[in-house]
Curated annotation (Swiss-Prot):
Family matches, as NCBIfam families: rpmH_bact (TIGR01030)
InterPro entries cross-referenced by the UniProt entry: Ribosomal_bL34, Ribosomal_bL34_CS
Name of this chain's protein: Large ribosomal subunit protein bL34
PANTHER family per UniProt: LARGE RIBOSOMAL SUBUNIT PROTEIN BL34M, MITOCHONDRIAL RIBOSOMAL PROTEIN 34 FAMILY MEMBER
GO MF terms, alphabetically ordered: structural constituent of ribosome
Length: 44
């Protein structure tokens, strides 16, 4: 059985990157919540 985590920076950015978050209303909600909480890093 292969391991489930096969790292790829491209996939990482495309699914969890800033532009991916900004592309949907819910993604923008995620960013707003992380800003409100005071996260040092908003994405990835």
């Amino acid at each position: 059985m292969k391991r489930t985590f096969q790292p790829s920076n491209l996939k990482r950015k495309r699914s969890h990157g800033f532009r991916a978050r900004m592309a949907t209303a819910n993604g923008r909600k995620v960013l707003a919540a992380r800003r409100a909480k005071g996260r040092a890093r908003l994405v990835v």
